[in-house]
């Protein structure tokens, strides 16, 4: 959520920056109307309440003096009715303004490339050499099916499309990656491990920006109004909702493994085979709470931490600086890390690393004090995948495949695989 005071005094500037996102700003123009009416109603209501108090005191004086107070009593009733009407209108205006504020995306950072679509994203850097195969490489779903380590067909029978059973060495590879990533981020990168709930309430989804805009993309438990988490970012960020931290606690860095659940409502027909786009998948998420002046340095560190996973796995990748039209709703600046997938002949996203500045913290009311009695300020929040496990499995299977269909296990994972060097 944007700062309403900043928006009020910089309306045209904010509007111009949001236009770079390519968002529909039809409702945005209502801000000035609603904000002005809200402030008018507040003034009118306070004036009438003040008058009501004065009249009430006058009535008390008249009654003590045994004088007729009927006219003033009638006047107070009229004032009370006006206050009630104004309060009702104020409540409606505030609800409309709140809905509008929750629907306004974050302001892009000045360093985000201006553009409309993914074609306008900018390559920040690349790492590793794309392997040239002496044979026609297979897609990971064929490799895994032939090896008996992934079963999409039975998962489709048990649940439906976009689900999978991991079996044997496939299940162990998934588990190895989870342990490897968590060990790396906690032991070397300084994150504290968290194992979060997989269901959250509506306030949590609103705090991180999934609601109200993206409710159709979420799986909801209607009987409880809980949501299955689309990412560990949601529960982990909301750990500190409605809290005031002190500056000595910052930065806070969490690494959280979780399963993630997404309806993929807008992805019909895309990536229908394999692990790239599943309704349920595992991920290690990195979440940070930092002082505002440190957040862009922390974004670079966060991105480097996610990159380090791919470097140790020796998987070629590139880092994209996302343009204003491809930032997503909540980010002020975002990097996507894309790993090379041979069967696609291109790079595919495996991590998004974002700085939300105070956007989420304002929605979730997460603040800190620089001094014991200082005025609370909103923290800046960041998060990034460190990494998506299923897509990492896909990248390993395809990049490490051999002509006979076996898979070389990356050296860094072998201690987690019981010393095995090959999946066959």
From Swiss-Prot:
Pfam family, one: Seryl_tRNA_N
Subunit structure: Homodimer. The tRNA molecule binds across the dimer.
Gene Ontology MF term list: ATP binding; catalytic activity, acting on a protein; serine-tRNA ligase activity; transferase activity
Membership in a protein family: Belongs to the class-II aminoacyl-tRNA synthetase family. Type-1 seryl-tRNA synthetase subfamily.
Keywords from the UniProt entry: Aminoacyl-tRNA synthetase, ATP-binding, Cytoplasm, Ligase, Nucleotide-binding, Protein biosynthesis
Protein name as it appears in the record: Serine--tRNA ligase
Cellular component, GO annotation: cytoplasm
PANTHER family: SERINE--TRNA LIGASE, SERYL-TRNA SYNTHETASE
Record pathway: Aminoacyl-tRNA biosynthesis; selenocysteinyl-tRNA(Sec) biosynthesis; L-seryl-tRNA(Sec) from L-serine and tRNA(Sec): step 1/1
Gene: serS
Residues at which ATP binds: 262-264, 349-352
Binding site for L-serine: 231-233, 285, 385
Organism: Bacillus cereus (strain AH187)
Record's comment describing the protein's domains: Consists of two distinct domains, a catalytic core and a N-terminal extension that is involved in tRNA binding.
Function of the protein: Catalyzes the attachment of serine to tRNA(Ser). Is also able to aminoacylate tRNA(Sec) with serine, to form the misacylated tRNA L-seryl-tRNA(Sec), which will be further converted into selenocysteinyl-tRNA(Sec).
Catalytic activity: tRNA(Ser) + L-serine + ATP = L-seryl-tRNA(Ser) + AMP + diphosphate + H(+); tRNA(Sec) + L-serine + ATP = L-seryl-tRNA(Sec) + AMP + diphosphate + H(+)
Subcellular location: Cytoplasm
CDD domains: SerRS_core
Swiss-Prot/TrEMBL GO biological process terms: selenocysteine biosynthetic process; seryl-tRNA aminoacylation
Keyword rRNA-binding: no
Enzyme nomenclature, EC number: 6.1.1.11
